[in-house]
Amino acid sequence: MPPSLLEVQRAWRAGIAGGDFAAALPLLVADAIAPEDRLGIYRNTAASTLVNALQLAYPAVRKLVGGEFFEGTARAFLAKHWADTTWLDEYGEAFPDFLRTFEPLRAHPPLAAYLPDVAALECAVNHALHAPDAPALDLRTLAALPPEEMQRLRFEPQPSIGFVRTATPADAIWNAVLADDEDAMRAIDLDEGPVHLLVQWRIGVDDDGDADEGGDGARLHLERMDEARWRFARALCSGTCLREALAESAAFDADFAAETALAEHLAAGRFCGYRFES
């Protein structure tokens, strides 16, 4: 009885992802190139494709460690985290956490202290760059709501929004590395952290929250926030209703101007819709 499609797919993955071709070899017809060699070619090609995807997603990490070390690290990552999807733009989300426990990196303590943080930022940046676009929430719809209804709002964030908290100033390191600015890199104080970052791909909104009718019209926005503002924004973007988000912000910092922060987030186009608390 011939194998099912699912069995063929599982055999193929075991070989390509794990190097175990025992189940896949009998399924191949002999040719000028031996079946095991052909599968080896496919496996090497797939691995090279994934390594390249990581290089594109983590350019600053690669520059910090060098191409040779990065490729070795990437291949060690592949051994534990093979791709589960063909959508390579999202591949490597587990890479920052992998770096935190990667033994060869621990031999370089200063680098090990901030490299995973830079990777976490680049992961959020990569997500923002490839997230689907969504029109910003029309503020006129909110203006028409009764005040009591506003408290029940749960905002729907822009798909590109990401929140990153790092122990080191990852944003400063990231900018300095990508700009090849050695002076800026030397001036960085690793004890400056923790830092709280918001990442967003912004379309049609300028830095004052007005419609962007000139320039690129769309760009990556990276903002360092104080912790209270960051926690409030993250709560709103995680689906916490406005009433609860306001209460949480007041409990964390009684002096935090949550209403002002909400107006700023709305003007910056950080939400694309809303629903009401059930």
What are these regions (language model features)?
Residues 1-136:
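N-terminal, charged low-complexity regulatory/assembly segments
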Residues 18-19, 180, 239:
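Short loop/turn hinge sites at secondary-structure boundaries
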Residues 23, 72, 170-173, 205, ...:
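A broad, structure-centric signal for solvent-exposed, well-ordered loop/edge residues
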Residues 30, 79, 92, 143, ...:
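Residue-level signal for alpha-helical context at structural boundaries
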Residues 57-58, 143, 148, 245, ...:
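Preference for short coil/turn "hinge" residues that link or interrupt alpha-helices
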Residues 80-219, 223-228:
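Hydrophobic packing positions characteristic
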Residues 205-210, 214-278:
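C-terminal structured interaction module
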